[in-house]
Amino acid sequence: FLSAIASMLGKFL
């Protein structure tokens, strides 16, 4: 779950 959020954040940034 956390990894998914980090991945989404990285993609957004």
Curated annotation (Swiss-Prot):
Keyword Secreted set for record: yes
Keywords: Amphibian defense peptide, Antibiotic, Antimicrobial, Secreted
A GO cellular component entry from the record: extracellular region
Expressed in which tissues: Expressed by the skin glands.
GO biological process: defense response to bacterium
Location within or outside the cell: Secreted
Function of the molecule: Antibacterial activity against Gram-positive bacterium S.aureus (MIC=200 uM). Shows no detectable hemolytic activity towards human erythrocytes.
Entry's family note: Belongs to the frog skin active peptide (FSAP) family. Temporin subfamily.
Protein name: Ranatuerin-7
